[in-house]
């Protein structure tokens, strides 16, 4: 059963880890961290040859390679902006704060991307974010029946390896009496298999290179770091995919703690 002593221990365990949002950088005891969890996972991914693939797509669709690369950059940046605004909304929601979407930020975004702006761009953006929020609220209605929030946007790290990350939602299941990690994903889809059978590399070559694997590994690394530093068990983690047309999808992560411990051990100074 969770108590104040548990909460204090959890708070103190990572008090030396800071996250600088503007630069997306972490420090440990005032010293720059070696890498984020996402950067660590990236080391085990096959490089994406964007130019070679863009050449194929450009030829197929009748665009120049540069136009295809620009389209991809726009889609990536748009998705990141939308995801950031959604995460900001959710963090405030758990603090019982209702906020409006940042109109200045989205207008500034499209000012910098005028090539891709249409008369409906802003309207479509609000519709996209409204869908994410609707699905999140459906998730919340399910979640609150058995969970309480412990930390939202919880910054964690491991001094021994220099690896840090941010947990979207660290919850406590008061029915099962255990911690649970939830992570919100706003991307278009979550692929369960590697493209044409693609696998990750090196010691993770037995794993499919796809979103489901990478997100499972991400949350397994969060769990592994938490268990290592606090000794609190985190038996399960879930991806909350909120970009479905009809509703959210609750996706139980693969158990990749063995792999997580292995790659963390290889990061030790």
Predicted segment positions?
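Substrate-binding/catalytic groove segments of enzymes
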Residues: 99-100, 178, 192, 228-235
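Accessory terminal regions of nucleic-acid processing enzymes
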Residues: 1, 95, 154, 160, ...
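Conserved catalytic cores of phosphodiester-cleaving nucleases, focusing on short active-site segments
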Residues: 87, 165-173, 177-201, 222
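Short, solvent-exposed loop/turn segments at secondary-structure junctions
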Residues: 157, 186-189, 244-245
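Gram-negative outer-membrane beta-barrel domains
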Residues: 159-160, 201-205
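A generic structural motif
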Residues: 157, 172, 240-242
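Metal-dependent nuclease catalytic regions and adjoining charged, substrate-binding loops involved
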Residues: 126, 208-269
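Nuclease catalytic cores
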Residues: 1-160, 164
């Amino acid at each position: 059963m969770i108590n104040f002593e548990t909460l204090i221990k959890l708070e103190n365990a990572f008090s030396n880890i800071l996250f600088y949002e503007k630069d997306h950088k972490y420090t440990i005891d005032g010293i720059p961290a070696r890498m984020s969890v996402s950067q660590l996972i990236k080391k085990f991914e096959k490089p994406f040859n964007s130019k070679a693939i863009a050449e194929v797509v450009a030829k197929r669709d009748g665009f120049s390679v540069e136009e295809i690369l620009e389209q991809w950059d726009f889609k990536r940046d748009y998705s990141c902006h939308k995801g950031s605004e959604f995460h900001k909304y959710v963090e405030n929601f758990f603090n019982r704060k209702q906020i409006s979407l940042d109109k200045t930020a989205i207008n500034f975004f499209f000012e910098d991307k005028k090539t891709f702006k249409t008369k409906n761009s802003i309207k479509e953006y609000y519709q996209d974010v409204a869908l994410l929020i609707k699905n999140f609220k459906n998730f919340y209605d399910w979640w609150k029946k058995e969970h309480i929030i412990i930390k939202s946007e919880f910054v964690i790290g491991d001094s021994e390896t220099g690896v840090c990350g941010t947990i979207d939602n660290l919850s406590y299941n008061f029915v099962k009496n255990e911690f649970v990690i939830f992570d919100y994903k706003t991307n278009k889809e979550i692929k369960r298999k590697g493209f044409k059978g693609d696998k990750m590399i090196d010691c993770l070559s037995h794993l499919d290179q796809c979103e489901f694997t990478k997100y499972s590994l991400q949350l397994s690394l969060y769990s592994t770091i938490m268990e290592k530093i606090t000794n609190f068990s985190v038996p399960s983690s879930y991806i909350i995919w909120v970009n479905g047309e009809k509703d959210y999808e609750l996706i139980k992560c693969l158990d990749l703690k063995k792999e997580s411990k292995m790659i963390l051990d290889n990061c030790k100074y």
